[in-house]
């Protein structure tokens, strides 16, 4: 129990750091196109460095069975998810995006029928109750910040990200089953989302030029 709580706290810390670093890159003139694509490019290189040869071979064999599904759901679960989450940082403060991200729990529960199960009402009500609490805590900050239409755009982007993330990941888990470990599945999805990220990186180069040293460093920290 203590181990689970500790893992949850550490995970929450690193995810919160992601929102802060994304906002920091935005405020210093960095493009969200680079913020999103660099995170997964660096992440792939890090995983490539630490994955054993046998594990990489196993992943490639599993991918070869259903390459189209891997490409689709990896792009959805990693690509669309992080693209829109990074884009949201252009329209709201890190605390606001972090608060909105709690919506992903509700989105994940509402997607349950797509996997042949009924919506679990108790977890749904608990998640909604938590969301109400988060909203009440941040309501005054929202009024003071005077974000206006930007808050609505950020909400839409986070909803897209919050839907793509659980849908893509759970679909991949259903396809893979027990044939891969969690780390191998992470490596495989990162690998198969690379075509999407390379396209985003090419668009970023065309629109804003190459990323700054500061953005490269911060993106590397997010990837870690």
Where are these regions (language model features)?
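Specific alpha-helical transmembrane segments that line the substrate/conduction pathway
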Residues: 34-35, 40-41, 85-118
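Hydrophobic transmembrane alpha-helices of multi-pass small-molecule transport proteins
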Residues: 47, 121-141
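Transmembrane alpha-helices of multi-pass small-molecule transport proteins
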Residues: 28-80, 107-111, 129, 163-168, ...
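Membrane-interface helix-boundary motifs at transmembrane edges
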Residues: 55-65, 113-122, 173-184
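Membrane-interface helix termini and inter-helical loops of multi-pass transporters
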Residues: 21-32, 58-59, 90, 138-150, ...
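Specific transmembrane alpha-helical segments of multi-pass solute transporters/efflux pumps
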Residues: 19, 54-101, 136, 223-224
């Amino acid at each position: 129990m203590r181990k689970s709580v500790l893992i949850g706290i550490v995970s929450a810390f690193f995810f919160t750091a992601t929102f802060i670093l994304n906002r920091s890159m935005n405020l210093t003139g960095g493009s969200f196109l680079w913020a999103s694509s660099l995170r997964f490019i660096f992440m792939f290189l890090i995983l490539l460095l630490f994955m054993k040869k046998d594990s990489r071979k196993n992943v490639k064999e599993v991918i070869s069975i259903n390459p189209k599904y891997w490409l689709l759901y990896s792009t959805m679960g990693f690509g669309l998810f992080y693209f829109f989450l990074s884009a949201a940082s252009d329209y709201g403060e890190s605390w606001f995006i972090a608060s909105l991200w709690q919506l992903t729990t509700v989105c994940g529960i509402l997607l349950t029928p797509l996997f042949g199960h009924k919506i679990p009402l108790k977890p749904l009500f608990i998640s909604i109750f938590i969301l109400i609490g988060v909203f009440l805590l941040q309501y005054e900050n929202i009024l003071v910040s005077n974000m206006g239409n930007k808050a609505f755009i950020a909400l839409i982007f986070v909803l897209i990200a919050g839907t793509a993330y659980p849908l893509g990941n759970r679909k991949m888990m259903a396809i893979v089953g027990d044939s891969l470990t969690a780390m191998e599945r992470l490596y495989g999805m990162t690998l198969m989302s690379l075509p999407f990220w390379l396209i985003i990186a090419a668009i970023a180069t065309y629109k804003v030029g190459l990323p700054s040293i500061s953005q490269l460093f911060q993106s590397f920290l997010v990837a870690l």
